[in-house]
């Protein structure tokens, strides 16, 4: 059986997303400052079954296994209680789908290797690193033709040739530090999505207490930190920590609602009466109030104890 490309990451032992990001960083550090960023339109929904089975037949001799895979691909989808036949695509979230994607896209990998290109692919996320914009445009043109051959469609809106520092890959982007050293950071889009998720988790609903909000929030942030620990921008993590705690303080103020309740709770937690009175006098301005002297009544230590550990630690 022909070996899978070394540039293929994801759903393979010892080839995680972090490994793919590190390899991409190395290519940019070597001077390949432009990237051909390919986005395949609804990839898992558009995989051609006959095309995929033809590739599998070259690797698998057992016809019984091939028949099972064909049945897996053609299994109907339950939509509003009705089974819809599937004529293309692989089951979303299915355990075999990522592996089948790697097999289908291996042809793309081999062609890029044959041409000597520096590239990284993680499932259907493909980045090719080149030295000039013109080289990137040529690669983009050839890849469009290759994907048409595989009956796949390039998303022209999202695919582009751009500077590597202006692109993102698997949630990370790159920046140039002193000495022209390439560093990793969390892509702005990933930070935006994270903040949207934090807002969802900290919405006041069903009368949840601050402690009840913090439990799922802490789990989410722990997972987020575990993935993005590869970033080389500790200041960004510190800023996010401050924003999260600002958000939690605002949520708690909103929970107290009325000025009298707010004043009583703040004083009970150690805030000087004059400061508590100023906050309570503007009881409807939760976000602004939560940036004041509230760190006395609701210190960072409280959120640590509630399970919202800091990203910057």
Located regions from the model:
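Hydrophobic/basic alpha-helical segments
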Residues: 196-212, 242, 294, 299-302, ...
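A conserved non-catalytic segment of reverse transcriptases
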Residues: 74, 144-145, 149-216, 220-222
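C-terminal, active-site-flanking charged/polar segments
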Residues: 136, 146, 165-170, 243-254, ...
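Extended C-terminal regions of large enzymes
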Residues: 247, 256-313
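Short, solvent-exposed helix-loop connector elements
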Residues: 85-88, 183, 199-213, 224-236, ...
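A glycine-rich phosphate-binding loop feature that marks nucleotide/adenosyl-phosphate handling sites
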Residues: 159-167, 216-220, 237-245, 260-269
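Amphipathic alpha-helical core segments of compact helical bundles
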Residues: 74, 101, 105, 109, ...
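Conserved polymerase palm-domain catalytic core
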Residues: 3-169
């Amino acid at each position: 059986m022909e070996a899978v490309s070394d540039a293929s990451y994801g759903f393979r032992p010892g080839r995680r997303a972090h490994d793919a990001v590190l390899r991409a960083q190395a290519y940019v550090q070597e001077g390949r400052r432009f990237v051909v960023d390919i986005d395949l339109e609804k990839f898992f929904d558009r995989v051609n079954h006959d095309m995929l089975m033809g590739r599998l037949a070259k690797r698998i001799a057992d016809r019984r296994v091939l028949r099972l895979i064909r049945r897996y691909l053609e299994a109907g989808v339950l939509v509003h209680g009705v089974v819809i036949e599937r004529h293309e695509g692989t089951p979303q979230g299915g355990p075999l789908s990522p592996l089948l994607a790697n097999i289908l896209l291996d042809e793309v990998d081999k062609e890029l290797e044959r041409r000597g290109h520096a590239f990284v692919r993680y499932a259907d996320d493909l980045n090719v690193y080149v030295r000039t914009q013109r080289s990137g445009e040529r690669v983009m043109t050839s890849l469009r033709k290759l994907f048409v051959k595989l009956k796949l469609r390039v998303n022209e809106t999202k695919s582009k040739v751009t500077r590597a520092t202006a692109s993102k890959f698997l949630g990370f982007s790159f920046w140039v530090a002193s000495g022209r050293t390439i560093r990793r950071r969390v892509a702005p889009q990933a930070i935006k999505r994270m903040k949207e998720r934090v807002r969802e988790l900290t919405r006041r609903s069903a009368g949840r207490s601050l402690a009840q909000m913090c439990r799922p929030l802490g789990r989410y942030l722990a997972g987020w930190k575990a993935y993005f620990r590869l970033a080389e921008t500790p200041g960004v993590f510190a800023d996010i920590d401050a924003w999260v705690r600002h958000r939690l303080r605002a949520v708690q103020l909103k929970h107290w609602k009325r000025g009298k309740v707010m004043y009583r709770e703040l004083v009970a937690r150690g805030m000087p009466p004059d400061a508590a009175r100023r906050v309570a006098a503007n009881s409807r301005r939760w976000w602004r109030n939560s940036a004041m002297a509230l760190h006395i009544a609701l210190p960072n230590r409280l959120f640590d104890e509630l399970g919202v550990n800091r990203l910057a630690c």
